[in-house]
C-alpha cells in the first residue's frame, strides 16, 4: 500500500478503531492495486461502519481518501456487494 499520502483519520478514534479503519482502507487499496476478496472487503467495511456510523462522515472520508489516493471506497464496496464472493480488481 502506498505511503505517499495521508489517511483520513479522526484524532478522537482509539487505536483499535484506527486499526479497523486502516484495514478497510487497505482493502480498498488492494482492490485497485491488485485483487481483493469481496468477502474480506465487506467484512472490513462492516467493522469500519461500527466506527464511522454517519453517512455524512463516510462520504467525507471517501472524498478525502479519493483526493489523496485516487481510490474510491464507495466504488470498492459497490463492486464487492455486486459479486459477493471471490476476488475482484478495480485496477486501472
Curated annotation (Swiss-Prot):
Pfam families: UPF0223 (PF05256). This is UPF0223 protein Sez_0908. It comes from Streptococcus equi subsp. zooepidemicus (strain MGCS10565). InterPro entries: BH2638-like_sf (IPR023324), UPF0223 (IPR007920). Belongs to the UPF0223 family. Coiled coil: none annotated. HAMAP family: UPF0223. It comes from the Bacteria.
Amino acid at each position: 500500500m502506498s505511503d505517499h499520502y495521508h489517511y483520513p483519520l479522526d484524532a478522537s478514534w482509539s487505536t483499535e478503531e484506527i486499526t479497523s479503519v486502516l484495514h478497510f482502507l487497505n482493502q480498498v487499496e488492494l482492490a485497485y492495486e491488485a485483487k481483493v476478496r469481496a468477502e474480506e472487503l465487506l467484512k472490513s467495511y462492516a467493522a469500519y461502519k461500527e466506527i464511522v456510523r454517519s453517512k455524512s462522515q463516510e462520504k467525507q472520508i471517501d472524498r478525502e481518501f479519493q483526493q489523496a489516493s485516487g481510490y474510491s471506497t464507495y466504488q470498492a464496496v459497490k463492486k464487492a456487494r455486486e459479486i459477493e464472493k471471490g476476488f475482484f480488481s478495480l485496477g486501472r
